[in-house]
């Protein structure tokens, strides 16, 4: 496949008002999407549009709507909703595509566009390529009698809450649970508190007063220390934090210890194995902690690593017939319950596992020993990151680093595809070994730069 002009691994994202993150580009993007869907479907397409709570979402929602309607597509405006909710609604409302206006865990001054297929999955490469090609064609407005219509959908919240509840057993209850819930002033702010309270939990809510500018600002999954402090303050059993668009989830245990995506993956894998639910291989990424790999091996649970990005985790799960995977950042995939990473659904799966296994998140993690891991970003003065990584002296240093931690950890290099940076990561069961190996390897990269 040729290099993408606009799309990254998870749609389009950037600073509002700069480059493609502008109203005029998004207007053309909506028009291109409408034309491509009409050609593929051979009929008037229906497109759902959702967004998170950042203020620029209003501008981009209007631009997308206008571009789609001009191309002859009908539009249903969902309003602020978690990204995975749009994936679900696109499928259940029989739409031809879903669009989410969000920059996920980024600050309010960023925004982005991501797409879902009619099946509620990430848009395939061929369709994205067709949209990019259509963007280079002139804006097209169909005849008046063929213009699309736009309506607001009023029952989306109720539909999504029932979908989330259906992901756990019918008798599932959270009456045992006192929790702190951090909604990142984002797309889960009006849904997650209602859902967990309906299931019986005592809920202390933070980060649920969006003003368009405070999304992810000192709250949410990128600021887990805030959640941890509140868990200790209120004496809660645990805390749950989502990111701005609700596709990530991290937690804190009853002592306020941060619980990342690797930890949650372990809780689910062990519980699902015991209940017979686990199928295929558990999938992590290059960044998944070596300690998790070792812990799963001790349980005879097969594990494989994909490239960083939930798109690649999803691809590996589908190819290998698995249903459970995720990233350290909190993107968890439970493909027997949802088509994409869903923070609320993933949190419910963890709570269901805890309900079976003694209610304590801290105890559920007592048999997982993660190893020290650190990443250093080496900025390059000149030359492409990929070329630096492939240089003979850097490859020699990498082989030496890998030999130093063999059987005790890992060492690897990741050239950035978007900036002149090489990411150097080392992990080992001994902190001094990890740091010494990291210093030598990152030094070799700096010397080559």
From Swiss-Prot:
GO terms for biological process: carbohydrate metabolic process; peptidoglycan biosynthetic process; UDP-N-acetylglucosamine biosynthetic process. It catalyses: alpha-D-glucosamine 1-phosphate = D-glucosamine 6-phosphate. InterPro entries: A-D-PHexomutase_a/b/a-I, A-D-PHexomutase_a/b/a-I/II/III, A-D-PHexomutase_a/b/a-II, A-D-PHexomutase_a/b/a-III, A-D-PHexomutase_C, A-D-PHexomutase_C_sf, A-D-PHexomutase_CS, Alpha-D-phosphohexomutase_SF. Mg(2+) binds at residues 104, 243, 245, 247. The keyword Ribonucleoprotein does not apply. Catalyzes the conversion of glucosamine-6-phosphate to glucosamine-1-phosphate. HAMAP family: GlmM_B. This is Phosphoglucosamine mutase.
């Amino acid at each position: 496949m040729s290099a993408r002009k606009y799309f990254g691994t998870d749609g389009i994202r950037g600073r509002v008002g700069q480059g493609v993150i502008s109203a005029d580009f998004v207007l053309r993007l909506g028009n291109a999407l409408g034309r491509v869907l009409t050609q593929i479907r051979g009929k008037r397409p229906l497109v759902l549009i959702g967004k998170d709570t950042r203020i620029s979402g209003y501008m981009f929602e209007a631009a997308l709507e206008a571009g789609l309607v001009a191309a002859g597509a009908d539009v249903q405006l969902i309003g602020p909703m978690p990204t995975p909710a749009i994936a679900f609604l696109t499928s259940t409302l029989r739409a031809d595509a879903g669009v989410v206006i969000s920059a996920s865990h980024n600050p309010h001054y960023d925004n982005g566009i991501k797409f879902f297929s009619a099946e509620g999955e990430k848009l395939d490469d061929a369709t994205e390529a067709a949209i990019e090609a259509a963007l280079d064609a002139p804006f097209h407005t169909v005849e008046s009698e063929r213009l699309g219509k736009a309506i607001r959908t009023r029952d989306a919240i109720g539909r999504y809450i029932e979908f989330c509840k259906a992901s756990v057993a019918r008798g599932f209850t959270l009456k045992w649970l006192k929790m702190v819930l951090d909604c990142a002033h984002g797309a889960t702010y009006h849904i997650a508190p209602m859902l967990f309270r309906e299931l019986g939990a005592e809920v202390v809510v933070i980060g649920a007063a969006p003003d368009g500018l405070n999304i992810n600002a000192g709250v949410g999954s990128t600021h887990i220390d805030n959640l941890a402090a509140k868990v200790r303050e209120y004496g809660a059993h645990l805390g749950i934090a989502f990111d701005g668009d609700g596709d990530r989830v991290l937690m804190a245990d009853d002592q306020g210890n941060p619980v990342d995506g690797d930890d949650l993956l372990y809780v689910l894998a062990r519980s699902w194995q015991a209940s017979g639910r686990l199928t295929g291989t558990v999938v992590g990424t290059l960044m998944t902690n070596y300690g998790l790999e070792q812990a799963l091996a001790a349980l005879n649970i097969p594990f494989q690593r994909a490239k960083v990005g939930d798109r690649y985790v999803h691809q590996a799960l589908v190819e290998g017939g698995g249903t459970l995977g995720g990233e350290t950042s909190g993107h968890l995939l439970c493909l027997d319950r949802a088509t994409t990473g869903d923070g609320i659904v993933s949190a419910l799966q963890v709570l269901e596992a805890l309900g079976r296994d003694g209610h304590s998140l801290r105890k559920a993690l007592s048999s997982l020993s993660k190893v020290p891991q650190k990443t250093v970003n080496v900025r390059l003065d000149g030359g492409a990151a990929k070329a630096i990584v492939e240089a003979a002296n850097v490859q020699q240093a990498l082989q030496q680093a890998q030999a130093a931690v063999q059987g005790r950890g890992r060492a690897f290099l990741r050239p950035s595809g978007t900036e002149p940076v090489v990411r150097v990561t080392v992990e080992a069961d001994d902190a001094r070994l990890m740091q010494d190996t990291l210093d030598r390897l990152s030094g070799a990269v700096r010397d080559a730069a």
